[in-house]
């Protein structure tokens, strides 16, 4: 995408069936990949070299931790969910901040025990209520990235919020939690991309 008037592009997936996702991603310049979906952007997240932009939601998790003064260094973090959109990038961003990270998923043996050991728990499995009371420990920080619709048609996260609120040190709600921060991260990425394009220092 060579149009100099465009500074950032978002790719909403799944794409229509007639479009080749790999070809679309290959056509997207890393400098305009403001949501970290291309292989080049993800490689920079995994290598920790600071080039490109990480996926906005994964970075939003770190922004929340920074805002509330939670320092990841030396902390035991558990991520539930292994997608390239949230789970894996969030794990890499935490590793780059010196956390000790365990990445779990819906087929992890004894998921509850893994979760209970965490000081920081990021739920991004895409399964409503997968993180229940049996997964939680006092004092934990829990970031719920899940977006699901329950049987009553309500928007809910991956975490049983009522159970978490009674036990953990802090938990993000759904809706009204990570999503708002994700939007702010996206806006910052676009602004940064525009500034780089114009050779302006922010």
Positions of the model-derived regions?
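Glycine-rich phosphate-binding loop
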Residues: 5-24, 117-150
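Core catalytic loop region at the nicotinamide-binding pocket of NAD(P)H-dependent oxidoreductases
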Residues: 7, 201-202
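Glycine-rich phosphate/diphosphate-binding loop of Rossmann-like nucleotide-binding domains
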Residues: 51-141, 154-165
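Residue-level signal for alpha-helix termini/capping positions
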Residues: 1-2, 66, 195
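Rossmann-fold NAD(P)-binding glycine/threonine-rich loop
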Residues: 20-46, 138, 143-201
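Conserved short-loop catalytic and cofactor-binding motifs
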Residues: 12, 49, 82, 174, ...
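Anion-binding alpha/beta catalytic cores of soluble intermediary-metabolism enzymes, centered on
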Residues: 8-72
């Amino acid at each position: 995408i060579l149009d100099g008037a465009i500074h950032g592009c978002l790719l909403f997936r799944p794409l229509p069936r007639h479009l080749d996702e790999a070809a679309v991603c290959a056509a997207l310049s890393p400098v305009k990949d403001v949501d970290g979906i291309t292989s080049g952007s993800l490689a920079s997240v995994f290598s920790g070299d600071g080039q490109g932009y990480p996926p906005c939601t994964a970075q939003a998790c770190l922004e929340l931790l920074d805002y509330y003064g939670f320092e990841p260094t030396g902390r035991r973090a558990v991520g539930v969910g292994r997608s390239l959109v949230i789970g894996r990038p969030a794990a890499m961003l935490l590793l780059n901040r010196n956390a000790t990270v365990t990445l779990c998923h819906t087929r992890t043996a004894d998921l509850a025990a893994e979760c209970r050991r965490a000081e920081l728990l990021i739920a991004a499995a895409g399964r409503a209520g997968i993180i229940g009371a049996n997964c939680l420990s006092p004092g934990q920080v829990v970031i719920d990235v899940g977006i699901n619709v329950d049987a009553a048609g309500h928007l809910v996260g991956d975490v049983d919020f009522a159970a978490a609120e009674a036990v953990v040190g802090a938990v993000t709600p759904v809706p009204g939690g990570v999503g708002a921060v994700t939007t702010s991260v996206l806006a910052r990425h676009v602004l940064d991309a525009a500034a780089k394009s114009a050779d302006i220092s922010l």
